[in-house]
């Protein structure tokens, strides 16, 4: 399944507003008023789930919400991520790997995941947080090339023809400290 499959399933019976940025969450008489970034109300809601990085959520949440204090200490590591597609299958020996002594933290063969198209070889590479921090602002094409070279090195495979590649700077990748609380809620459980 795709990463958004759960959300799509849960939203099946809901009216979804796409291409809409929430600019403010404001207390209302019966819950919360969501305003778009132009200040227009999108309606009042009993409960709100904010699923963005803590640094961004703290700006969005109302100042009187208890959550701002709770989430203000949460910080994230960055990660450069590369997706590459290959014309030929690479291997059937593994689906994922955590390389040791490498600038790569994780390698995944996405086409081996359930319900994914296995007709094409797709590899996702995640760089380590330390390496990614040092490469903030780097040229994505140069990052992709460097991480692909590292992939060939740690995998021991001979380089293969790439049909496409894309690098993405993921500013809020993983929490610096593991969060054991699950999710954060305000006192009456109306904002998570």
Q: Where would I find each of the regions flagged by the language model?
A:
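Short beta-strand to alpha-helix junction loop
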Residues: 1-9, 17, 134-146
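Helix-loop-beta segment of a Rossmann-like dinucleotide-binding subdomain
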Residues: 1-8, 31-33, 124-132
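Generic structural signal for small/hydrophobic residues in well-ordered secondary structure
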Residues: 10, 49-51, 84, 125, ...
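Short, well-ordered alpha-helix to beta-strand connector turns
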Residues: 13-14, 45-46, 188
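A conserved short coil-to-beta-strand element within the FAD-binding core of flavoproteins
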Residues: 18-33
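Central helical "cap/lid" subdomain
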Residues: 41-95, 157-159
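Active-site substrate-recognition segment that forms the wall
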Residues: 81-136, 142-156
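Flavin (FAD/FMN) cofactor-binding core of flavoprotein oxidoreductases
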Residues: 145-146, 152-189
């Amino acid at each position: 399944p795709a990463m958004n499959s759960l959300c799509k399933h849960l939203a099946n019976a809901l009216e979804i507003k796409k291409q809409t940025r929430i600019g403010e969450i404001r207390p209302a008489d019966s819950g919360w008023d969501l305003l778009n970034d132009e200040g227009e109300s999108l309606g009042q809601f009993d409960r709100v789930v904010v699923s963005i990085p803590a640094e961004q959520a703290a700006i969005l949440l109302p100042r009187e919400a208890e959550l701002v204090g709770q989430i203000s200490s949460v910080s994230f590591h960055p990660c450069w991520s590369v997706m590459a597609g290959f014309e030929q299958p690479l291997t059937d020996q593994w689906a994922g790997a955590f390389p040791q002594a490498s600038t790569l933290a994780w390698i995944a063969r996405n086409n081996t995941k359930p319900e994914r198209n296995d007709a094409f070889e797709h590899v996702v590479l995640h760089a380590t947080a330390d390496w990614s921090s040092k490469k903030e602002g780097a040229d994505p094409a140069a990052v992709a090339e460097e991480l692909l070279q590292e992939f060939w090195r740690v995998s021991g495979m001979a380089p293969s023809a790439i049909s496409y590649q894309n690098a993405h700077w993921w500013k809020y990748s993983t929490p610096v400290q593991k969060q054991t609380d699950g999710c954060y809620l305000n006192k009456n459980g109306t904002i998570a």
